[in-house]
Every structure is written in structure tokens, then in C-alpha cells.
């Protein structure tokens, strides 16, 4: 596995593979890798000839009161997992490499971001599409791999790829979970022992919501209340940041219960904010 830190070396390495007619699979990450990331790598390994992973904690998607400096980083751990997983190139740029000068232009997301994380984190998704535009141009992948856990991000990135004609096939992979149902996340390390024991209730609540919808329930307030009551059975969380239903991928109010629906949750614990979701009537790509 090659570890590359600058744009020019990456471009040259990618061009060499393109000249050999190799297909490129790309897994963008912010590091502190876990099994969820490696599942994306596994899919890329099976479906493409050459796998590139980036590890870059992107400052432009963090708000002024968010945890950019505290975000967990462990390059040695990431490199070990990436190599064991079959990554061919690990791209680990500095902030200066990706943002060498102040931006002269700005990408602004106007749809799919007025609710959930988009509402709570102003400018977050602008930062996401900005860095992915840069990285997509550098890696020039055939396939790019994302996890369903970040479903709103997936919807936003799908819009980016469609709007700007990126010749990239987005592959959306099911959320990887612990044995007790908790979605794998780099932020799980911040949970106390009691919080970690109780956090799987988020997934349990979402499953309840799914069951209600699939049984024909269309009273949104009732569905949300049942899920809220379930989460509140385990009192270690500080608050429920959101628990809501929307059409997917539009993130507008549900008007047709036979089409794509997302049930999404964000729950705040003492040092971690965990997100999870269930997609209904949605085929993964």
C-alpha cells in the first residue's frame, strides 16, 4: 500500500492505473477507521481493480462550536487497517494541501438540507460538497462508496454528482452495526459505559417506527411518539436532537407512504451525538 500526502503524486499514481485500464474504487473518510469503513473497502475491493482511501478531517464541515480539534485521529491505526483491508493508496493530505489558498468560489447546497443535520449544522453540507468536489477531481474514481448511516449526506452527495455530471457511480452500503444493533461510529468511543449499554435503544426505536409504517400506520405524530417513548426508556442520554420522518431522498414531508421514506434520529449523550436511520421503500445503489 502506498501512503501519499500530496496532490501531484496522487494524480500520477491514478493516471498510471487509468492507462492500464484499471477501474478505481474510492472510499472517502475522516479517519479513525472502524469496521464500517472497512466494509466499504471490502465492497470496493470486490467491485473495482484499484482502491483509494482518503483520510482527511475536513475543517470546512465543522461549525464554530463543533469538535474539529477534538475529532479522533490515529494515522498509524488507520494505515494498518487500510493495508490489511486491501487499500492500494491511502491519501493523507494536510489541510494546506486541500485548501492551499482562500476559496475564490463557494458551493452552496440548496435542497435536502433544511432539516435534521442540515438545520442543526449551518454550512456543514456546503463543506462536505466542497471537499468532495476537490477529492473527486483528484481521485477520478469509477465508484465511490458511502455508508447508509450518513443518509442525509448520501442524498446531498447524490445531488452533487447528478447536478455537476460527475462520471461516478455512487455505491451506498448498509450501515454496519455492533452485535447489539448500535451503528458503528468513530464517536462511539466517547460514550461512558452506561451510555454504551443503553445506546442500542436508538436502533430499537427506529425499528419500531419501521414496523409501524410497514403495518400501515400513517399518523406521523403517533409514530414519532412511540419511538420517543422507546428511547426515553433508557435515560442516560441528555436529549433527543431530532426524531423525524421525511421523504427520501428529498427530505420533504411525507405525502406518499408507498415511496421512499427515511426515519432519522440524533441522540445527544454527554460527549457524543449519535445518528442513525432506517430507509423504507428505498433501493440501495
UniProtKB/Swiss-Prot annotation:
Annotated GO CC locations: cytosol
Entries under SUPFAM superfamilies matching the protein: Nucleotidylyl transferase (SSF52374)
Molecular function GO labels: ATP binding; pantoate-beta-alanine ligase activity
UniProt-annotated binding residues for (R)-pantoate: 61, 153
Keywords noted in UniProt: ATP-binding, Cytoplasm, Ligase, Nucleotide-binding, Pantothenate biosynthesis
EC number(s) from the headed UniProt entry: 6.3.2.1
InterPro entries, sorted: Cyt_trans-like (IPR004821), Pantoate_ligase (IPR003721), Pantoate_ligase_C (IPR042176), Rossmann-like_a/b/a_fold (IPR014729)
GO BP terms: pantothenate biosynthetic process
Binding site for ATP: 30-37, 147-150, 176, 184-187
Primary localization class, coarse: cytoplasm
Active site: 37 (proton donor)
Pathway field: Cofactor biosynthesis; (R)-pantothenate biosynthesis; (R)-pantothenate from (R)-pantoate and beta-alanine: step 1/1
Major enzyme class: ligase
Binding site for beta-alanine: 61
Known catalytic reactions: (R)-pantoate + beta-alanine + ATP = (R)-pantothenate + AMP + diphosphate + H(+)
Subcellular location: Cytoplasm
Oligomeric and partner information: Homodimer.
Miscellaneous field: The reaction proceeds by a bi uni uni bi ping pong mechanism.
PANTHER family (alphabetical): CYTIDYLATE KINASE/PANTOATE-BETA-ALANINE LIGASE, PANTOATE--BETA-ALANINE LIGASE
Job of this protein: Catalyzes the condensation of pantoate with beta-alanine in an ATP-dependent reaction via a pantoyl-adenylate intermediate.
Family: Belongs to the pantothenate synthetase family.
Protein name (database record): Pantothenate synthetase
Organism of provenance: Listeria monocytogenes serotype 4b (strain F2365)
Lineage: Bacteria, Bacillati, Bacillota, Bacilli, Bacillales
Gene: panC
